[in-house]
């Protein structure tokens, strides 16, 4: 499984407990039933060095297989779901920093990165985090915000994942033994909802390498 920012009024996002949901392109039991459960589905998670070389970009994609056109225009983040990016800076496989993202009324609100002392399947929005920010959720035109050196984006993007799911199913079912070269990209021309946070490396710290993963948690 692929695992898987500045000051705003804390009243905008109410404090609530969120419980973790497992996902990976709709094949996890918690999200393969469709309906509201699919809104927590994590399709992919990416982390890479930013263009300046002094930052790290974290990209969490949710709600895969969104068709172009009206389906993408009408796709929305679930306001009862928080996206949590976990960052392990010391190599002990436990998060040291967390970035939370939750939508409200057409905007995505971010909290962190802030220090995390323990791992848990449930979370509370850290409305007292020193680093906070928000960005309008994009439509056809991408909207970004930059504050305190942290950049934010939330909205629909083309799904970059390449996978021949039909051939994969045939291999699992015993009717094929290998993938074709080239294969057919099942995800071509489909979209996802993306949350992107680009953070200065100085805010991450650590020894130079990190472990990172993402979770969705439902209220």
Regions from the PLM with identified roles:
Residues 1-22:
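Gram-negative bacterial Sec-dependent N-terminal signal peptides
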Residues 22-219:
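Surface-exposed extracytoplasmic segments
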């Amino acid at each position: 499984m692929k695992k898987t920012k500045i000051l705003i009024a804390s009243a905008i996002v109410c404090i609530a407990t969120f419980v973790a949901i497992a996902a990976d392109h709709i094949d996890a039991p918690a999200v393969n039933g469709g309906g509201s459960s699919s809104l927590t589905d994590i399709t992919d998670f990416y982390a890479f060095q930013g263009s300046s070389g002094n930052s790290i970009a974290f990209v969490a994609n949710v709600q895969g297989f969104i068709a172009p056109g009206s389906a993408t225009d009408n796709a929305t983040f679930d306001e009862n779901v928080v996206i949590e990016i976990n960052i392990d800076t010391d190599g002990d496989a436990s998060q040291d920093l967390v970035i939370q993202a939750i939508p409200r009324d057409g905007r995505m609100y971010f909290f962190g990165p802030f220090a995390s002392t323990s791992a848990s399947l449930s979370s509370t929005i850290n409305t007292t985090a020193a680093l906070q920010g928000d960005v309008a959720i994009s439509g056809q035109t991408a909207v970004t915000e930059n504050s305190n050196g942290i950049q934010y984006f939330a909205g629909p993007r083309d799904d970059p994942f390449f996978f021949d799911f039909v051939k994969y199913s045939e291999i699992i079912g015993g009717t094929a033994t290998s993938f074709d070269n080239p294969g057919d990209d099942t995800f071509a021309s489909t979209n996802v909802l993306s949350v992107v946070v680009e953070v200065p490396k100085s805010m991450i710290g650590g020894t130079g390498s990190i472990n990172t993963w993402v979770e969705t948690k439902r209220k």
